[in-house]
Regions:
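A short, N-terminal "cap"/entry segment at the start of jelly-roll beta-barrel domains
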Residues: 5-8, 14-44, 85, 93, ...
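Short acidic-glycine-tyrosine-enriched beta hairpin
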Residues: 37-40, 49-50, 79-99
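Extracellular/periplasmic catalytic domains that process cell-envelope and extracellular macromolecules
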Residues: 38-39, 61-62, 69, 84-85, ...
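Flexible, surface-exposed loop/linker segments and immediately adjacent secondary-structure boundaries
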Residues: 38-45, 88-91, 112-117, 122
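A short beta-loop-beta micro-motif enriched in histidine and acidic residues
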Residues: 51-66
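Histidine-centered metal-chelating micro-motifs
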Residues: 55-57, 76, 92-108
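Glycine- and acidic-residue-biased ligand/ion/polar-headgroup-sensing regions
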Residues: 63-81, 90
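Ligand-binding loop in jelly-roll beta-barrel domains
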Residues: 97-128
Length: 134
C-alpha cells in the first residue's frame, strides 16, 4: 500500500503538467539581462544564436521600441514594410506595439543560415516586454 501511495504522489505532477500551456519563446536565447534605467524604466538586453530560423511566433512588444543588431550571420525583418535581409553589423528598429511574426509571406532563408543577434528593448518596469499572440 505504501509503494502504491508513493507511486501516485510521484506521478501526479507528471500527469498534471500541461505542455500545451507553455509560453512561446524565441529560439536560441543565450543570455538575457535587465538593467534599471530609473524612472520606472528598464532595458532588456538579449543575445540569441540560431540556425535555420525563418521566422518567430506572432507577437508584439509594448515597449518604447526594440533594436535588433546582427552580430554575425543573416537575419530578416519586415519592420520597414517589406522583407529585408540584414547581415553582420546591420540592424533594424521595431516600433512599439507592432504585431509581427508568424507571417504567411515570411521568406525562407537558405538551409544552414545562422544568425547571432543582440536585441535591446526599453520597457516600463514590471510590465511584459514581449506579448505572444495565439
Amino acid at each position: 500500500m505504501y509503494k502504491l501511495l508513493l507511486t501516485l504522489l510521484v506521478s501526479i505532477p507528471l500527469i498534471a503538467h500541461d505542455h500545451s500551456a507553455e509560453k512561446p519563446t524565441f529560439p536560441g536565447l543565450i543570455s538575457s539581462e535587465v538593467f534599471n534605467l530609473g524612472n520606472d524604466m528598464v532595458m532588456h538586453v538579449e543575445r540569441r544564436n540560431s540556425c535555420n530560423q525563418d521566422g518567430t511566433p506572432k507577437h508584439f512588444h509594448p515597449a518604447a521600441g526594440t533594436l535588433v543588431y546582427v552580430l554575425d550571420g543573416t537575419s530578416q525583418s519586415k519592420s520597414s514594410g517589406s522583407w529585408k535581409e540584414y547581415t553582420k553589423n546591420e540592424y533594424w528598429f521595431e516600433k512599439s506595439d507592432w504585431v509581427h511574426g508568424g507571417e504567411a509571406d515570411t521568406p525562407s532563408l537558405p538551409e544552414g543560415t545562422c544568425q547571432q543577434l543582440l536585441v535591446i528593448r526599453v520597457a516600463e518596469e514590471g510590465k511584459e516586454h514581449t506579448v505572444f499572440i495565439d
